[in-house]
Regions:
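Radical SAM/AdoMet-radical enzyme domain recognition
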Residues: 49-65, 74-189
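A short acidic, glycine-rich active-site loop
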Residues: 38-43, 125, 288-290
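Short, small-residue-rich loop/turn micro-motifs
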Residues: 9, 22, 117-119, 186-190, ...
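Canonical Radical SAM [4Fe-4S] cluster-binding loop centered on the CxxxCxxC motif
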Residues: 1-47
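Radical SAM enzyme [4Fe-4S]-AdoMet core and its adjacent flexible, acidic
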Residues: 27, 130-137, 141, 145-253, ...
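Flexible mid-to-C-terminal extensions adjoining Fe-S/redox cofactors in radical SAM and related proteins
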Residues: 271-374
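Cysteine-centered iron-sulfur cluster-binding motifs in ferredoxin-type domains/subunits
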Residues: 6-14, 70, 254, 300, ...
Length: 374
């Protein structure tokens, strides 16, 4: 089983698409009003780590992902848990500003590190704060120099300010650090901000055409270089298309990937902090392999591309911050992604038949913090 572990709600940034929205006058949907939030949830991990270890011992192969807030604000806890927990596989999702604080022996235990970057310096700093891009890139070079050999994923948040083609191309090839693993998530249907946005025009004129271009670029790289870039919104669905597999919610939330709150309660998703009516247990009394499932419901269950998309996002499915028509625009981006990948499928199969690439090139860590469907 996979578990996100919330260490702290504190963060050393106030990104425009995250904490800064707390200062905006946003609409509140009926679904959001129906959510019960546990206001007593501690700001930081407030239980004895030994309770966590006993819980994890009941899982023969747990994977633990450190999460926040910014988890590296509690580097002390990260180091302690990595050294003591009965876990072989660790991951972390971080803004990257404090990565240089981790000693080499701790770094070496992480199979995957997800670092938040949105594209070029100007875009990243506009979203996340002045100097963030340079500091993060410097820290990435530092941990590589210290011997870190695991997967580094550039995790982008995509908004109307993003030229998706330019941003992905930059992160894939630049003089600072070039990522072979990239994921992006669209900032859409997560808050009641649609009336403040120009989402429709951006999706139609920039994002959807850009995805078609990027899929072509992705397959071009396979043909010329004989390797498959780990661009996760393409990688995971294409692997399923090759094997003709259907998919549940691709991030695994609510059935394979759970979140441990700062008080030890267990929820289905790291975004659903404090949503107590969706808790499925507590680390002091639950078995990690016997947790209830929290599933996608409503309009997604009857969707024609459900087995491709999986439902996109459990939190959005429950809270529905955007209206029906607006949610349809988000679904349109997924349909565009699906059409682009299906159009590229014959070419990918030809490259496999010719021996340029092999099916195993699409293998990857499941539930690694990439939602897959943007």
């Amino acid at each position: 089983m996979y578990f996100h572990l919330i260490l702290t709600d504190d963060c050393n940034l106030c990104c425009s698409y995250c904490r800064a929205k707390a200062f905006e006058n946003l609409e509140v949907s009926e679904g959001e009003r129906a959510v019960q939030i546990d206001e007593s949830l501690p700001n930081e991990m407030a239980y004895d780590p030994e309770i966590l270890y006993r819980f994890l011992e009941s899982d023969p192969s747990p994977t633990l992902t450190f999460y926040g807030g910014e988890p590296l604000l509690r580097t002390d806890l990260v180091e302690r848990i990595v050294r003591e927990a009965p876990v072989k596989r660790f991951m972390i999702q971080t803004n990257g500003l404090l990565l240089d604080r981790l000693p080499p022996d701790i770094l070496g235990r992480f199979v995957t590190i997800l670092v938040s970057l949105d594209g070029r310096k100007a875009l990243t700093d506009a979203n996340r704060g002045n100097g963030v891009y340079d500091r993060v890139m410097e820290n990435i070079r530092i941990i590589r120099a210290r011997g870190y050999t695991g997967e580094l994923i550039a995790r982008m948040t995509v908004t109307e300010k993003t030229d998706i083609v330019e941003a992905v191309h930059h992160l894939a090839s630049n003089a600072d650090y070039s990522f072979s693993s990239i994921h992006w998530q669209i900032d859409a249907n997560f808050a009641g901000d649609f009336s403040l946005r120009r989402f429709r025009k951006w999706a139609d004129d920039c994002y959807n055409p850009g995805i078609r271009m990027l899929v072509d670029d992705w397959v071009d790289h396979m043909e010329t270089e004989g390797s498959v870039l780990r661009w996760y919104p393409f990688l995971d669905p294409m692997e399923d298309l090759l094997y003709e597999r259907e998919s549940r919610l691709r991030c695994g939330s609510g059935y394979a990937n759970y979140t441990i709150m700062t008080d030890g309660n267990i929820g289905p998703c790291p975004v659903m902090i404090g949503m107590s009516q969706y808790y499925v247990g507590h680390i002091s009394r639950s078995h990690p392999l016997e947790l209830d499932h929290v599933i996608i419901r409503g309009e997604c269950t009857d969707c024609g591309i459900r087995t491709f998309c999986g439902g996109r996002c459990l939190y959005s499915n429950i809270t529905q911050p955007w209206g029906v028509a607006e949610r349809g625009l988000v679904c349109g981006t997924i349909e565009s992604l699906r059409h682009a990948l299906i159009a590229a499928l014959p070419r990918v199969r030809r490259l496999i038949d010719e021996g340029t690439i092999v099916p195993g090139d699409f293998a990857h860590e499941k539930f690694n913090g990439c939602e897959i469907i943007p």
